[in-house]
């Protein structure tokens, strides 16, 4: 059951773990699109909502914080197009604030942390938040040596050659600067230059660009620096990384020093001493925003004193001494021409509004997500009303559309004054528009609440689900078959020729054999050719042996993301052991079921989804045919020669004082142990810290070896 609409307080620990798994996967996907490909597909507001949901879950269930948690990372992994650069100091992101109350809370938290009274004034800087690409530029002995993108905050992309083409960035600094200087700032494209570039593209009959931010990022990632040079990119300096000697002791003075060294700095930056002044400057910048020749999406506030910044320090991914006050998303009015239903891999029916084209924030918008059936009716994910009942969205309505840097914006509200009498309420389909199967809304057995998503029950007989499943199967983190992308999958799926048809995963691996005796050769079809077909067959054959976690992930089991697949592979070791365990766990009781639930990071929601998947004969039959073609490799185990805990199952409970829970888990796994989240007959060791409760009691009841943290350290160190 989906819990994404449920209040955090109502979730069980298993439901929270399942949702954190989903959020980690979903946020990582959007990070990769935004930071790695410059192709965001959701709005900033929706992205921020995902992050806030993740933070709320982690605050309530701190023991569930994952190693791949979005709260522990910045941006996306660097691409492989450019060589990697490890930042001398991490490039962290900023926490966001969205209201005056949020800003007041931020300032109050600074005063509290420093033990300052309100009458002991602390100065802040306030400057526009440029909507561009973050950059770190390193100078040694005054000469530009390296320029790198933010990447994941630790490692970025080397774009030095392209940065040298930006006229505003000096290649040589004045005499007397520190030996090592890292200037950080934002590369952007001016609005006027963006419009001129699009006029040029139109004149040449080429596709125009979406927005200045994406265009700047794409221009900076050109393999040919001449292309970058032609794009007239610009730069604002506002921060620093490694600095061998600090030329000033305040944020404001540091930025003014950058200006003296020849860097452009934003003229709207101010030093202010009160919340009222900060908010007034925010409003002032907001009023100037339409007339600026560059895009901004908020105002950044920083504690001015570098000494106080040092005392305030950092959280895991952001400084305590800074925040970004975001502007509201841009809005416009247009008409809903049609509501269409898309069917995804898991059968979810997602409504999309086709809009009368409208320009919002410099981008032509023709589609808007409607999320689900309830959203159309004005009901939020938690069952709360987000619009008056009569403000349901209908075909023919005039609506308010919001866009915040996304490709598919969202509809906020209906303009009732413009609703025509003949406009009728939208009837959400109860039958899948693709396969004709029933589409149902499940009820969460624990909360009794209806799931906000309606799903097709057709499974693999539904073409939409089948094609999306195949696309998932060949995706990068699954089988990763080069040359078999979305368009190719659609071609093979729709083809009626038995020698070309691919409708299940095993048929990918029989394609070459079927083609040998066919009169219809793939190489003779437009879009393929002999060379590309040869490469496709080679890519397919390269995947006849595959890592176990990739195989499990590729199966497309609901709730089983890449991280969960790795946990399962590490726990079971072989596919045979995994499949046997799933079958033995079918009664939802017994040792196999308990062992599955005991795996750290696997809760009842995920476990139930896996067991249900293996109960379906069609799934078992398809996997059987797949195993005739493919061999999942045994999961790699850490080298643990001489380890006293190799092969043992360990449970940590209570408070740990010398390690964080993640550190203890990582250390145990590096020594060959399996870390479980609950105690069962197969548990070998329970490490109990202060506050240990029911897990320790159960361990004693079962006769499992127990020890405190010091005894555990002595064991693994001996």
Swiss-Prot record:
The protein's Enzyme Commission number: 6.5.1.2
Ligand binding (NAD(+)): 44-48, 93-94, 127, 150, 186, 302, 326
UniProt entry keywords in alphabetical sequence: DNA damage, DNA repair, DNA replication, Ligase, Magnesium, Manganese, Metal-binding, NAD, Zinc
SUPFAM superfamilies: BRCT domain (SSF52113), DNA ligase/mRNA capping enzyme, catalytic domain (SSF56091), Nucleic acid-binding proteins (SSF50249), RuvA domain 2-like (SSF47781)
Top enzyme category: ligase
Known cofactor(s): Mg(2+); Mn(2+)
NCBIfam families in UniProt: dnlj (TIGR00575), PRK07956.1 (NF005932)
Function summary: DNA ligase that catalyzes the formation of phosphodiester linkages between 5'-phosphoryl and 3'-hydroxyl groups in double-stranded DNA using NAD as a coenzyme and as the energy source for the reaction. It is essential for DNA replication and repair of damaged DNA.
Family, per entry: Belongs to the NAD-dependent DNA ligase family. LigA subfamily.
Record's protein name: DNA ligase
